[in-house]
């Protein structure tokens, strides 16, 4: 060999930094059915791009399964009775070729369940002046508390509690009108300790008026063999009537019955007037 020197060449090796996700907070809590806050992703390397995939508990829905860049706001639903979670696995990549990938980081959205009222029956009926049955409210979540307000139609009804928490107590309610009264208890369930508010429900108490029977004339005089024509009236529309009939004398043709008109042919078999009592 001649040991002749060659022509030098310069070789430049660029060593790109490995990016990292630098968000200080990597989780948030929301209530089922509400919208999460968008997540602006940050890195220690300018120009870093992000890709992410999401996995959630069975029973959660509404979240985006994958994406790039920031994590957008999402309305997430849950049919769970305990807290669920959506976990976003975020991979940062540097801006220059070969786009070095950093260590994946997990961002978690915890989804607290929203309670619902689960009572099988949501109504009852009483007559005015009677006492309601107390209503023990139930939910799909054991720690649920309830607040409720009552609205009465007509507003003249008395005896009901205007608002309260948890059990709706037994109450003696008076409806002095001639129409059916309705008291609607608007119930809002909330989950303790998360405070998540569920879908409101209504419990209804129907308060029926007590009808009063009346006739145009309370005392009528008839000749034997004449048919009565006594129209029965009431202060409450739709009232039905039943009656019993009796007489201390010798009267034929009377009897118990039902309907809106008492039509009976009464025959006095004696020589003296006798009353018939309905």
Regions found by a protein language model. Name each.
Residues 1-278:
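Extracellular low-complexity Ser/Thr/Asn/Gly-rich intrinsically disordered segments
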